[in-house]
Amino acid sequence: MHTSTETITSPSGPMGVHVVRPEGDGPFPVVVFFHHGPGLDEGSKQTMARIAEWGYYVVTHDRYHRAEPWYAMQGSGDDEMKKMFGLVLGTTEEEVAEDLGALLEWLPSDPAARSGAMGCIGYCIGARSVLCTIRDRGDAFRAGVGLHPSFCTTDEPDSPHLAVPSYTGSLYIGFGSADTMQPASDNTALIEATNALDKGEAEIHDGADHGFGVYGGAYHEAAADRSYERAKVMFDRELKG
């Protein structure tokens, strides 16, 4: 795999982007990776490589660049948890959308990134960004995957799940049955809306906890394997077909 980290210009200042893609010139279809709350840790980088092995140009932006460039959670102590949640709650979806716009403006400068239909995948708070992206840029992003989603079903009038019924691309949402942080039972509306799509699928994975899709302490092999199996089918259909 070829990996690179760049600093690009965003409306809010310098912003890091990290790319994992196959060796060679490409161009390869683009999959935008929205990392989870703990930041772009080693488990996330390994997960990006897993997707890139399917033949994709996988790129993520530094979600927390306004506060702490390339933050990656260190341990699970109270202070670190407080810091991480502060970053999660302190970064708005409007800011993420602004960052995505900067990323999309930069992509044509890399000849390895293919133009045309794109996919996106997100974890935890990143799954919320997936739903907001298919809402705002559904014509460009033809496949979306959200694993162990956070803050996707709320009582607010702009709750991300409300965008699902109008999406015409492929969407996969995966929950863990053991997830008490963001349980599937709190996301019934999202599950029902996803399963009602022509090309949508929501699943609850038995025994999997929050974080099951990222290599690390909460990784759940069976749930991850099933989720990535479905993700690959959707990406291949929408981006390579």
Walk through the language-model features, giving the residues of each:
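N-terminal cap/leader regions of alpha/beta-hydrolase-fold enzymes
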Residues: 1-241
